[in-house]
């Protein structure tokens, strides 16, 4: 269900015209601190000094502030535990919205059934290391690597991921926070290690992903009507409420 598989498919298909094996950078962001969200603990650090009951009070206060008001999001996120805050980055629906769409869901089905055991292994680590840990064992393992492997193999292309070599993995696990994010720069240690090898314009270029403009496509009547007809004409009644 990752939209990035669309451009990845075409990149893999084109690459296969020229080579049989490719090297890819999967894992570098999770291991070396490449995601922008890993900078968040710095901005929220002052909240860590506030007693728990008062922090929860700030969260309740933020709920009554008008939507869009400056500082509302900061107060809310600062009042939350890392586990709840970081999971929220991946949430597309509130439980109420999800239940309206899929009435068979229940509050007992919680993301913590999956994440609690992973977070438990990172108790006592710094916040960024904990965020990286959850990403490695959910997002990286369950999405990124699966997607890359299946799409490249669908094009008879072999994918190698050198950043996930055991020696590299073990070295990255020993890095302190200030060698992951330094001077506002992500993946600082990795960039330093490669600066005599990789050209400057590549080393510090703007981060590029594989974005797919699905929202833009579906905003147009042709694609919207097509997608809606697929849903309404499908046998999906057992999965979700089509009227929602």
Give a label for each model feature.
Residues 19-35:
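Short acidic/histidine-rich active-site segments
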Residues 33-38, 217:
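Short aromatic-enriched loop/helix-cap "lid" or pocket-rim segments at secondary-structure transitions
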Residues 6, 26-27, 185:
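Short beta->alpha linker loops
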Residues 17, 21-23, 69, 73-244:
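Adenosyl-5′-phosphate
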Residues 1-9, 51-58, 233-237:
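Short, basic, helix/turn surface patches
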